A protein has these predicted regions:
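N-terminal Rossmann NAD(P)H-binding glycine-rich loop of SDR-like oxidoreductase domains
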Residues: 3-23
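Conserved cofactor-binding/catalytic machinery of classical short-chain dehydrogenase/reductase
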Residues: 42, 84-91, 102, 124-125, ...
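NAD(P)H-binding glycine-rich loop region in Rossmannoid oxidoreductase-like domains
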Residues: 44-84
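C-terminal substrate-binding subdomain of Rossmann-fold SDR/epimerase-dehydratase oxidoreductases
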Residues: 165-274
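Adenosine-cofactor binding site in Rossmann-like domains, unifying the SAM/SAH pocket
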Residues: 28-48
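NAD(P)-dependent short-chain dehydrogenase/reductase
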Residues: 115-119, 123, 127-178, 183-192, ...
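Rossmann-fold scaffold of SDR-type NAD(P)-dependent oxidoreductases
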Residues: 6, 57-63, 105, 206
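Conserved Rossmann-fold NAD(P)-dependent oxidoreductase catalytic core, especially the SDR/UDP-sugar
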Residues: 61, 87-120, 135
Length: 274
């Protein structure tokens, strides 16, 4: 099958493209880091995007300007951040309206958290998707090897990099809880959509580990894997999610279940970063 992956060079997109290629699929990738001609927020690229979409069987819409909690804490209220994401969604959904290709929109478990613009924007993307009869998945803190500027790294990558220097300085008290999932498991979940296994377009497909873990426990897991590391607690509370704990839908378990433990996933990242 020929698949277009939008956001093909991101933390999820890059390993997904490699995984689907290994499974025999033909992958076309679009990412603004490849070329300004692949910047989805630029309306001058819509014609080329439509032509590319016309040549494929399915579209995976991962592209979004995003980063970890420290990035969101700074950028979430910026005009440029909001504007870029609105434009890239508008242009992409316009192309999907014309091509009518089956597509999967990558949303977030934060889509109901409208105190953040990120959550609101993902909710907006879901509304676009529903209007076009597309599929929706929601990511819950997917982690893996990241190739981005330090400001955008997510918490696990951030902690591993700090642990290499012998000290994990946390921004928060570590009491906030998250559900983490390694990109290997995420790849298999998305592959089940590519293979047309999902059976109800009205469902939200939560791609998560279904296990809560406190951030301090993430730091301690990294410490256990990497040797003597000093952990310094911060003073901030959960500024991004404000302690909200959504309950993931387990509908996706009919087609996919996560396999890697948090420790196993972190070990994979540690080995790559070293």
């Amino acid at each position: 099958m020929k698949i277009l992956v939008l956001g093909s060079e991101g933390q999820i997109g890059r390993p997904l493209c490699a995984h689907l290629t290994s499974r025999g699929h033909q992958i076309l990738g679009w990412d603004k880091t490849n070329s300004i001609k692949e910047d989805l927020s630029d309306s001058r690229n819509i014609k080329s995007l439509i032509e590319t979409m016309e040549s494929v069987d399915r579209v995976v819409f991962l592209a979004f300007e995003v980063g970890g909690s420290k990035y969101l804490a700074r950028a979430d209220k910026d005009f440029a951040y909001i504007d870029e994401n609105v434009k890239l969604m508008s242009n992409t959904f316009k192309a999907l309206t014309i091509t009518r290709k089956p597509f999967l929109f990558a949303s977030s478990q934060m889509a109901n958290m409208h105190h953040t613009n990120y959550g609101f924007l993902k909710d907006l993307g879901e509304r676009y998707t529903k209007s076009l009869g597309g599929w929706i998945c929601r990511f819950w803190n997917v982690f893996g090897v990241e190739e981005c500027e330090d400001e955008k790294t997510h918490v696990i990558t951030d902690f591993i990099i700090k642990a290499k220097e012998g000290k994990i300085e946390m921004r928060t008290t570590g009491e906030e809880a998250r559900q983490f999932l390694h990109t290997d498991d995420c790849n298999r979940a998305l592959e089940s959509w590519v293979n047309d296994e999902w059976d109800d377009i009205g469902q939200y497909y939560d791609i998560t580990s279904f296990e809560w873990v406190n951030i301090i426990d993430v730091a301690n897991t990294i410490k256990d894997l990497m040797g003597p590391v000093q952990i310094i607690l911060g003073e901030s509370t959960d500024e991004v999610q404000r302690g909200i704990r959504n309950i993931p839908s387990e509908y996706i378990k009919r087609f996919w279940v996560p396999q890697l433990s948090l420790s196993e996933g972190i070990q994979k990242v540690v080995e790559k970063i070293k």
